[in-house]
Amino acid sequence: MAVNTLLKNEEIKRLPDYVEPYYREGVDGIIVQDMGVANVFSENFPDLPLHGSTQLSVSSEYGAAFLKNIGMTRFVPSRELSLDEIRSIKSKIDIEIETFVHGAMCYCYSGRCLMSSYAGGRSGNRGRCAQPCRKKYQMGDEYAYMLSLKDMCMLSDVGKLIDAGIDSFKIEGRMKKPEYVAATTYAYRELRDAYLSGCSDLTNLSVRYENMLRDIYNRGGFCSGYYFVGNGRQMLADKRPNHTGVKIGKVTKINKPFVEIKLSSDVHSGDVFEIRGRQGEVEITCGVDAIADKCISVKGKSFQLISVGNQVYRTRNNRLLNDIQKNIIDNDRKINLRAELTAKIGKKMMLKLSSLGEDICENLVIGPECVSAANKPVTEEQMLSKIKKTG
């Protein structure tokens, strides 16, 4: 559970009441930035694991040791650290480390950015960042998205992260769609499991999943953050601050109302294309399935913005999104449960659920007090039917 913003004094007073329902339901940890918040949790919920947020800007073994000494069990180091620096901290301090492996990156130091607060009164340290780093800025004659960074993708280096002692992978997903969340978590779990099982073909596997994630969301490609190279212009997505898509062809002919596109990749009906030229962008929808090297005709619009030779990008891969929905999101894992229902007049109804199999888990749900039936009493078969409706 994330409570990793800076709180005001009057908000801290209400914090125990806010967290208590989640605590009673079994939340397994809380990530914090504010040391006052950490102190409140330690006093009111002493057995609740606390994790230090990347907003704390912990960048050394001394910071890690401090967090361990005040009772934190895990922390997310500054995103500006290299893998060697993270490995060094892990070798010296016995504390779990969680690092970012995928998603949007901040231009500023973790937890230190005041730009959104100054520019629009929305503090990033209060969870309200307006993302001014995704705006265009001018420097001399250059006018570009000078503070907009590419998204991070560490799929090809999952093994190196594990070998460095990193305990948990963190995926940035602010305001992202379910398909993004499902695909990224699935890809990293697959690579992690493959590496730990000794898979000999991780390169092809990582390339396949990276191509999938690039089709879902990327800003001018991906970068590896500060893990290896450090900062540099190669980290910037200065041409476009949002989803770039993937290049699938170019315009070869204009025959109103149609545009002919020579494909460099397979496309599918329902895909959304963007034709990009010097005059601007035009969004169109593909109505056919076609393979690379073929030419297709797509109904166009805003022809004053389109020229022969314009590059065409796919910003929505319809078949991929449908596959993710079907094979990952809707593919719920089923487990066998044992249910014990106790209902006695004058006593509170109790339902005990226990999982069957390798992962043992129990949960006790206490309901209202049982009373005599005013009309027809509930039968055992009816209760069993209701319980089975849960899945």
Question: Model segments located where?
Answer:
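Surface-exposed amphipathic alpha-helical tracts and adjacent flexible/coil segments at the periphery
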Residues: 1, 9-16, 20-23, 32-36, ...
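Short glycine-enriched loops at secondary-structure junctions
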Residues: 5, 33-37, 56-58
